[in-house]
């Protein structure tokens, strides 16, 4: 193992995903500090990254970490697919570009769980700071920030019917689900600029790469954190087939590798549950049993109909649609597949929506890998506040081995009931006058699936995760399984922070990219204030 000469860098950031790109930008704003950003993947130049509707084509390619859970006991023993971006921008270069912040009560809940300074009033300024919203500046939105938030450029005409049918089914129309109220139906806001994906790499990293005090290294496998006593002194990276090199950090090491890789790196570094570490062949360094626990994700299932006579994404792969996108950045290929969003409560007594609907003019099954020859419509209920909790743990002491994951999806009866209610409500929306006459047949679950046992069996057979893993380095000053404190410092260690979706105590009620960017914006201020 070799050691880089001197303390060349003040901050070493692991992971050039959504959080890492923000941190690299904000920390390097100070010209007196040196920042190194390390990324295991490569560049984000692929057309599959830039063309919005092509995001499912990235799945299970070299752009994807391609994680999967262990056999999940409550979904017929299936392994659930968990894609994660392996390139600059991380999953912001792979996701569906849906800009959703979550609910004020989500963040107030974080504060109540031992994270002072993370209530909604505290985090809202960081959402605003990061944003360049085409709607302009307001009490809830920013203009002139790095991240472009747009209206959809070429929405499907079916969206009007989806909005009207949702309203007819009792879901009110809402102007802005990222404002003070979330419940209702509206069009998705998207992280696109002129019909093209606008990732965290586009927004935060590329403008900062001209700075002489920021270095970026891609295709670097980080093997773990190096310590000097209880202080993080740098990171160990792979060099060649068998060698390694230590990259020192004079001030801090910051893990921003995401909710799967950040806990994996802590565990590989000997930080975690000592008994589990020994079982994986890792010598324990610091007992912190919460590392990898508290894994949460949003499960979803699709309800799909074949329809007639509407503008759908069927045939979007034809050359004329590619030509339209290349020449005008418009047309079907600007679609995020899910174009209409609804948040609703499926029963009384809930403090907030338990279901989010992703609606679109497309056939979307098996993560977009399954095809259907015909025009379709999908309404997919997503469980936004799951009670199930899972874990990330090591498969071995080899950093090249993917960690083991288990979400325990559908292990809690309340989760099952909310999902079943969401499937029924999807059918109710489709049965309203604006949509009813378009439908020729229900493809998923299918017209024959009617009674409760059949519907639940279908749910367990087809349930998927919607790519929002969080919670595996829980933030709290007081919780017994907390990994980081409210300043995002790893408990019991020095000069080591986790700044990404791992730190969420509970998953937010909506998509997770915007909250991850917010976490990094707030975390960057904490790091600079501590310097």
Model-identified regions with their sequence ranges:
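N-terminal redox-cofactor-binding region of secreted/periplasmic oxidoreductases
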Residues: 1-531
């Amino acid at each position: 193992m070799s050691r880089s000469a001197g303390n060349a860098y003040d901050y070493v950031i692991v992971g050039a995903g959504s959080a890492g790109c923000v941190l690299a930008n904000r920390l390097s704003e100070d010209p007196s500090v040196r920042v190194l950003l390390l990324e295991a993947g490569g560049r984000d130049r692929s057309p599959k990254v830039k063309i919005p509707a092509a995001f499912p084509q990235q799945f299970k390619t070299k752009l994807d970490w391609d994680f999967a859970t262990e056999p999940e006991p409550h979904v017929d023993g299936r392994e659930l697919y968990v894609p994660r971006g392996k390139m600059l921008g991380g999953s912001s270069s792979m996701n569906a570009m849906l800009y959703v912040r979550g609910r004020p009560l989500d963040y107030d809940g974080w504060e109540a769980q031992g994270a002072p300074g993370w209530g909604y009033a505290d985090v809202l300024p960081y959402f605003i700071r990061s944003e360049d919203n085409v709607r302009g500046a307001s009490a809830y939105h920013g203009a002139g920030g790095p991240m472009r938030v747009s209206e959809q450029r070429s929405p499907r005409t079916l969206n009007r019917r989806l909005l009207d049918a949702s309203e007819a089914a009792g879901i009110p129309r809402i102007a802005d689900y990222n404002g003070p109220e979330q419940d209702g139906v509206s069009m998705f806001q998207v992280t696109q600029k002129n019909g093209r994906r606008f990732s965290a790499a586009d927004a935060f990293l590329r403008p900062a790469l001209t700075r002489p005090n920021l270095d970026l290294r891609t295709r670097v496998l980080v093997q773990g954190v190096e310590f000097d006593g209880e202080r993080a002194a740098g990171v160990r990276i792979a060099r060649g087939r068998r060698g390694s090199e230590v990259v020192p950090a004079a001030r801090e090491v910051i893990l921003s590798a995401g909710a799967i890789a950040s806990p994996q790196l802590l565990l590989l570094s000997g930080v975690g549950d000592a008994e589990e570490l020994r079982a994986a062949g890792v010598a324990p360094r610091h007992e912190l049993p919460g590392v990898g626990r508290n894994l949460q994700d949003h499960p979803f299932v699709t309800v799909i109909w074949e329809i007639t006579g509407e503008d759908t994404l069927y045939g979007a792969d034809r050359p004329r649609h590619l030509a339209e996108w290349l020449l005008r950045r418009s047309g079907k290929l600007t679609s995020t597949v899910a174009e209409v969003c609804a948040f609703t409560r499926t029963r009384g007594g809930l403090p907030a929506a338990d279901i989010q609907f992703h609606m679109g003019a497309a056939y979307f099954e098996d993560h977009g890998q399954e095809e259907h020859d015909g025009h379709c419509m999908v309404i997919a209920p997503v469980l936004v506040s799951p009670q199930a909790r899972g874990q990330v743990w090591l498969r071995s002491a080899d950093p090249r081995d993917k960690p083991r994951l288990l979400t325990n999806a559908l292990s809690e009866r309340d989760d099952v009931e909310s999902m079943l209610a969401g499937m029924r409500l999807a059918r109710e929306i489709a049965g309203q006058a604006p949509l009813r006459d378009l439908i020729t047949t229900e493809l998923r679950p299918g017209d024959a699936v009617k009674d409760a046992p059949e519907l639940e069996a279908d749910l367990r057979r087809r349930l998927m995760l919607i790519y929002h893993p969080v919670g595996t380095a829980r933030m709290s000053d007081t919780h017994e399984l907390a990994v980081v404190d409210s300043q995002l410092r790893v408990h019991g260690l020095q000069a080591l922070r986790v700044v990404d979706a791992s730190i969420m105590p509970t998953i937010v009620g909506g998509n997770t990219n915007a909250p991850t960017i917010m976490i990094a914006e707030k975390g960057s201020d904490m790091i600079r204030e501590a310097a």
